[in-house]
Amino acid sequence: MKLSSCVLIFLLCNTFSSISAFRLSRSQPTERISGSAGDVLEDDPVGRLKVFVYELPSKYNKKILQKDPRCLNHMFAAEIYMQRFLLSSPVRTLNPEEADWFYVPVYTTCDLTPNGLPLPFKSPRMMRSAIQLIASNWPYWNRTEGADHFFVVPHDFGACFHYQEEKAIGRGILPLLQRATLVQTFGQRNHVCLKEGSITVPPYAPPQKMQSHLIPEKTPRSIFVYFRGLFYDVGNDPEGGYYARGARAAVWENFKDNPLFDISTEHPTTYYEDMQRAIFCLCPLGWAPWSPRLVEAVIFGCIPVIIADDIVLPFADAIPWEDIGVFVDEKDVPYLDTILTSIPPEVILRKQRLLANPSMKQAMLFPQPAQPGDAFHQVLNGLARKLPHERSVYLRPGEKLLNWTAGPVADLKPW
């Protein structure tokens, strides 16, 4: 026992001496972000596209929010704030004939349980109803069957509209949205709920709340690995092998007693402050591969350790996530301590410099009011990069590609 304790002390001293260079302070010089699409985070979309916003009856959006204002602070709130942003954005046009894109403001995630969980079961019928409305009252949907339209679908599995992955896969993306561009938080390669051309965005995290918890920049990062959240979802996965594909359970079982890992199910009032004192923040998958932890880690300069195989991260065509985060395969979770302690200090320092770049943080947020370079502008930049539309977008007279009667029978009922 004494020998193992000595070995542990030696390892701890060795580890923390090797990271002393970046443990002293949270303050780091910034480094310019250069994404795979070029230096685009600071691009201004104004003048590059025009968006027409459909004026739908309030039952599709505003009345739903009036019924439950909690939706404003939910991690799916991007669908609400996107509409508000576009209504006052200089890219908006009131003349649909000059529009490059058409936006359909439908709030599909604002039907919440008493515990604040979204119930997406009515969403397919609501979406079908909205599409039928615009197809009947404007000519623009019918000329492309939605190929120059975009929708914000921020639910767990996007436009598959189910919170359980197996059932979401069985449903697939709503057939009427097959040609539209989907703006969604869900992103996983080779998954039926992420179609080609979708724009993956960060989940909503309240900017003002995070701002109010900032601590002095020179505060030491004295926590090596930090995580707060569920390891087991006993209520929905009693045997523990399905939730997070076992990755969270593996974190707990392997590292609950490791002094380098500050992990717990308890969510302290100092959660945001603790993230600012940490070097690495675990961002494992849950029921879906994404969560607000990624946004929080970036905002607080904590290197995100992404444990979610095949995840597609927000604005991946503009942000060099490989340079900013650490990716760990789900099967390699038992070796997490070795992986993280093996990263050279100079690599960690560079990741911290990239995270310190204000444009990186801004791209993760949906602030009110909007600010240059924020997530709203990154969505518009993503849409602008798709222009001009290919000729194949426009259908020949009388041509029909979508099947209006496809999908589950329950989805065809009037809403």
From Swiss-Prot:
<dbReference type="InterPro" id="IPR040911">
    <property type="entry name" value="Exostosin_GT47"/>
</dbReference>
<dbReference type="GO" id="GO:0000139">
    <property type="term" value="C:Golgi membrane"/>
</dbReference>
<dbReference type="Pfam" id="PF03016">
    <property type="entry name" value="Exostosin_GT47"/>
</dbReference>
<dbReference type="GO" id="GO:0010417">
    <property type="term" value="P:glucuronoxylan biosynthetic process"/>
</dbReference>
<feature type="topological domain" description="Lumenal">
    <location>
        <begin position="23"/>
        <end position="415"/>
    </location>
</feature>
<dbReference type="GO" id="GO:0042546">
    <property type="term" value="P:cell wall biogenesis"/>
</dbReference>
<dbReference type="GO" id="GO:0080116">
    <property type="term" value="F:glucuronoxylan glucuronosyltransferase activity"/>
</dbReference>
<dbReference type="GO" id="GO:0071555">
    <property type="term" value="P:cell wall organization"/>
</dbReference>
<protein>
    <recommendedName>
        <fullName>Probable beta-1,4-xylosyltransferase IRX10L</fullName>
        <ecNumber>2.4.2.-</ecNumber>
    </recommendedName>
</protein>
<keyword id="KW-1133">Transmembrane helix</keyword>
<comment type="function">
    <text>Involved in the synthesis of the hemicellulose glucuronoxylan, a major component of secondary cell walls. Probably involved in the elongation of glucuronoxylan xylosyl backbone.</text>
</comment>
<feature type="glycosylation site" description="N-linked (GlcNAc...) asparagine">
    <location>
        <position position="403"/>
    </location>
</feature>
<dbReference type="GO" id="GO:0005802">
    <property type="term" value="C:trans-Golgi network"/>
</dbReference>
<dbReference type="GO" id="GO:0005797">
    <property type="term" value="C:Golgi medial cisterna"/>
</dbReference>
<dbReference type="GO" id="GO:0047517">
    <property type="term" value="F:1,4-beta-D-xylan synthase activity"/>
</dbReference>
<feature type="glycosylation site" description="N-linked (GlcNAc...) asparagine">
    <location>
        <position position="142"/>
    </location>
</feature>
<keyword id="KW-0333">Golgi apparatus</keyword>
<dbReference type="GO" id="GO:0005768">
    <property type="term" value="C:endosome"/>
</dbReference>
<keyword id="KW-0808">Transferase</keyword>
<feature type="transmembrane region" description="Helical; Signal-anchor for type II membrane protein">
    <location>
        <begin position="2"/>
        <end position="22"/>
    </location>
</feature>
<dbReference type="GO" id="GO:0006486">
    <property type="term" value="P:protein glycosylation"/>
</dbReference>
<comment type="similarity">
    <text>Belongs to the glycosyltransferase 47 family.</text>
</comment>
<keyword id="KW-0812">Transmembrane</keyword>
<keyword id="KW-0325">Glycoprotein</keyword>
<dbReference type="GO" id="GO:0045492">
    <property type="term" value="P:xylan biosynthetic process"/>
</dbReference>
<keyword id="KW-0735">Signal-anchor</keyword>
<keyword id="KW-0328">Glycosyltransferase</keyword>
<dbReference type="InterPro" id="IPR004263">
    <property type="entry name" value="Exostosin"/>
</dbReference>
<feature type="topological domain" description="Cytoplasmic">
    <location>
        <position position="1"/>
    </location>
</feature>
<keyword id="KW-0961">Cell wall biogenesis/degradation</keyword>
<dbReference type="GO" id="GO:0005794">
    <property type="term" value="C:Golgi apparatus"/>
</dbReference>
<dbReference type="GO" id="GO:0009834">
    <property type="term" value="P:plant-type secondary cell wall biogenesis"/>
</dbReference>
<keyword id="KW-0472">Membrane</keyword>
